[in-house]
Amino acid sequence: MADKLLDLHQRRDEAIHAGSPRSVERQHEKGKLLARERIDVLLDPGSFQELDMLARHRAQSSGLEERPYTDGVITGWGTIDGRKVFVFSQDFTVFGGALGEVFAEKIHKMMDLALKVGAPVIGLNDGAGARIQEGVVS
């Protein structure tokens, strides 16, 4: 059991640091906040609950050999002034924040949950379009 928990913690750490150190540095050099940093600024401290942190793309196409966690978008919910909101934040450090199949599924799931509870959705966009390697589903 301890091995499985250690594996889960390692995967979670990989997801939190999904972008390469160089891509993180480039974002900061441009004066941009990272996806998680934007969420932290927006929401009440400690309120963010992430959905599907360990999601990865399923594409078999060339050019998509890497399979970082999050698939380029952070999704979840938190509060602003104590009121529940759902949020997604594109992660430019992972695939340039480009839309893919799993990326879209994560946003769709988050929007469905927001609709069920009557909470607003906030999108923090910083992406490079769509991953056409994944075909029409992206």
Where are each of the predicted segments found?
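Terminal-region recognition feature
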Residues: M1-S138
